[in-house]
């Protein structure tokens, strides 16, 4: 991940840390609401996801921030849109709002590169101050790449390595936008 590695040179990095969950879905309530992963099933898909919490988004809303959650998947997928609403996000942007089926990966939602470009365009339209959260999809099983990138990223020892390289590339394009 050459681009992500390059960002670490300009970041506060903790080398001795642990993940707050086993799956990517566990990161969302940890980051947004400070909720640790304490259950076998993800908090977002549990009956507890509608509990009252006062997390980062609600605090930013009180400070007159515009808040938006981005996820290139279908509404209802993993209850991301529901959790975004309960967490207090002003807006949710997913596959329906993106509205370009040619960039659909056939499984999770919109490929990272085009959805991150959409994300950048929307960010540029927001008035300040704002807070936006983006959940990327392409680095998830079954690890599909867009047809025009099939030969661009080399295989690695694990199938996920190609799509992680693609996500790294997509993030670089986002930062260049």
Give the location of each predicted region.
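Solvent-exposed soluble domains appended to multi-pass membrane proteins
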Residues: 1-177
